[in-house]
Amino acid sequence: MEFSVKSGSPEKQRSACIVVGVYEPRRLSGIAEQLDKISEGYISNLLRRGDLEGKPGQMLLLHHVPNVLSERVLLVGCGKERELDERQYKQIITKTINTLNETGSMEAVCFLTELHVKGRDTYWKVREAVESTQNSLYSFDALKTRKGETRRPLRKLVFNVPTRRELTVGERAIEHGMAVSAGMHLCRDVANMPPNICNPAYLASQARQIAENTENLTVTTVGEEQMEKLGMNSYLAVGRGSDNESVMTIMEYKGAVDNTQKPIVLIGKGLTFDSGGISLKPGEGMDEMKYDMGGAAGVIGAMKALCDMQLPINVIGVLAGCENMPSSNAYRPGDILTTMSGQTVEVLNTDAEGRLVLCDVLTYVERFDPELVVDTATLTGACVIALGKHASGLFSGHNPLAHELLNAGEQSGDRAWRMPLWDEYQEHLESPFADMTNLGGRPAGSITAACFLSRFAKKYNWAHLDVAGTAWNSGANKGSTGRPVPLLTQFLINRAGVDQGE
């Protein structure tokens, strides 16, 4: 898909289709009024006849509108003018793209980016239009022998901005939107891959592919032999039951002009399949445990977006690849593990494995002397119960970092909700035999999991994102969502100090 931005009047556009908005009840947007004027009331007459009410998502395709150079005009219902918010705007863009494809338009000039969206500027509207367009066109059929015959002729989309001085902002928005979309696309592709293909080594191979096309990205891996020398016994224990070797992939991006700038570290839980181990999960829905590497998929997607934008910061992405399987060699409930930090953990349940992998990675990244560390993981079902599918759980003892991430989530529409990390919850992890247990019981499960991780993140500013509810969808629309790529990428854009708006 080719995107561009321009500033012009609708009557001068020579395109396959012009897209303009209509408000409820039957009220023309400013651009639609211009078209109505040059067409001598053609559009307003249709509305008076009741052809379109203007309700959100309603579509009316017009052919050969009088005095309009473009072959078609697509009227898009936008709801009530004062109520148009970001959620409705995204839905309208998605419906518009689907309609353009279904009706055979190869190119279009879209004036929806001129609509007033509460609290949003031109940069946001153009970037969100790009991201919504790309997401609506995504499909995963790489492993199907019979590909779907979806009609997708749309090849070029031009977004109109109100003034010429906003062209630079619009171009930047397209650049950023394309990068975020590419990151989400990669995240979804990797996460949707079946576990017989996507194993820890596969994660490493995907990282190397990005490095092949990015001069300032280097990729190294840490295998089981090296982990053993490092004392990463907790990480190793989780993968012990699998024939697939555990692999930790390090993606080091150097974009800062100042070589001494401390790196931001992003850690992704990469359980490419989680059977639960000896504490075996129920069979129903176990196929979705291929998505237990959603955190790593999010990190590799964010790193892809970062490389495409070439942001002037230093970032290290760590993919904690592992597979949790039952076997005679698997770790057991009752085992006591000595972590890389030296702290000991009593295993109460082998299905609380993500934290056992992440705790050693949190210790490992101390060597990078990081500016800050954000780990992202499909860590707990308890977070799904607490927040559902709309918000990721955010945990941090560092208020400025927490606020940065929450703000990035609001900016990108990939929202998070801050959860408590109070000392009282630490008591749930007490063990009579070790420094702590790996399970705090049913109450406050997502919080006690974060409390566990916090014990290994004392030497830097740290935040934890639990994306168990947001990384993938179940049911008829089963598949990766591409989250938290938008949140992580927006956080990096903000950190880089890149100009984003007016």
Swiss-Prot record:
GO biological process terms, semicolon-separated: proteolysis
Binding site for Mn(2+) 1: D274, D351, E353
Keywords annotated in UniProt: Aminopeptidase, Cytoplasm, Hydrolase, Manganese, Metal-binding, Protease
GO molecular function annotation: manganese ion binding; metalloaminopeptidase activity
InterPro entries per UniProt: Leucine_aapep/pepB, Macro_dom-like, Peptidase_M17_C, Peptidase_M17_leu_NH2_pept, Peptidase_M17_N
Catalytic activity: Release of an N-terminal amino acid, Xaa-|-Yaa-, in which Xaa is preferably Leu, but may be other amino acids including Pro although not Arg or Lys, and Yaa may be Pro. Amino acid amides and methyl esters are also readily hydrolyzed, but rates on arylamides are exceedingly low; Release of an N-terminal amino acid, preferentially leucine, but not glutamic or aspartic acids
Cross-referenced Gene3D superfamilies: Leucine Aminopeptidase, subunit E, domain 1 (3.40.220.10), Zn peptidases (3.40.630.10)
One Gene Ontology CC term in the entry: cytoplasm
Active-site residue numbers: K281, R355
Domain of life where this protein originates: Bacteria
Pfam families: Peptidase_M17 (PF00883), Peptidase_M17_N (PF02789)
Subcellular location: Cytoplasm
Residues given in the record as Mn(2+) 2 binding sites: K269, D274, D292, E353
Enzyme class per UniProt: hydrolase
NCBIfam families: PRK00913.1-1 (NF002072), PRK00913.1-4 (NF002074)
Protein name: Probable cytosol aminopeptidase
Organismal lineage: Bacteria, Pseudomonadati, Pseudomonadota, Gammaproteobacteria, Alteromonadales
